[in-house]
Amino acid sequence: MPTQAKVATVAELTDRLNRAQMLLVADYRGLTVAELNELRKKVREKGGEVIIAKNTLTRLAAREAGKTEIEEFLGGPTALAFSYDDIPGVAKAIDDFFKASKKDIKVKGGIVGTSKITGADVERVAKMPTRDESLAKILGGINAPASRIVGGLKGVMRNIAYILGAHAQKGAEG
């Protein structure tokens, strides 16, 4: 018979799985508690979270959430990274952290939307522009034509002012 704590944990995991746009399953073997906390901090800054949960409870939650694709990645010490907003930002934070740690830790795989991804796919996702970078590009694209129009209008106004000034000066002399 499952305990209330385990039932609550499965419910929390199911909720996270349902809310997440991306879930990554990683082997964290070899990381110290301080390093794991640093990883959590970096992922939290990107709008995600990293948790450690028992594989059996994660498996139950995955079945409840309809995300059974991750079951093949659940084995050994497993960290779960959830991204609720900035998929490339969280993937990049994890990828950069793992590369910088120089330990034999890796992302086993995960889910982006409804698609299963492998550890190799995570590197490609990490290279995508983050949400903020994408917004900056969009706003820059929108702003560029307006800036050119304003620049053109300033030039026209400057020319009109020059012509009126020259005409007024000519009238004063004449």
UniProtKB/Swiss-Prot annotation:
InterPro entries per record: Ribosomal_uL10, Ribosomal_uL10-like_sf, Ribosomal_uL10_bac, Ribosomal_uL10_bac_type, Ribosomal_uL10_CS_bac
Presence of the UniProt keyword Ribonucleoprotein in the record: yes
GO biological process assignments: translation
UniProt KW rRNA-binding keyword: yes
Annotated keywords: Ribonucleoprotein, Ribosomal protein, RNA-binding, rRNA-binding
GO MF annotation list: large ribosomal subunit rRNA binding; structural constituent of ribosome
GO CC annotations on file: large ribosomal subunit
Domain of life of the source: Bacteria
Family designation: Belongs to the universal ribosomal protein uL10 family.
Protein role: Forms part of the ribosomal stalk, playing a central role in the interaction of the ribosome with GTP-bound translation factors.
Subunit structure as annotated in this protein's UniProt entry: Part of the ribosomal stalk of the 50S ribosomal subunit. The N-terminus interacts with L11 and the large rRNA to form the base of the stalk. The C-terminus forms an elongated spine to which L12 dimers bind in a sequential fashion forming a multimeric L10(L12)X complex.
Xref: HAMAP family: Ribosomal_uL10 (MF_00362)
Protein name listed in UniProt: Large ribosomal subunit protein uL10
Organism per entry: Herpetosiphon aurantiacus (strain ATCC 23779 / DSM 785 / 114-95)
Lineage: Bacteria, Bacillati, Chloroflexota, Chloroflexia, Herpetosiphonales
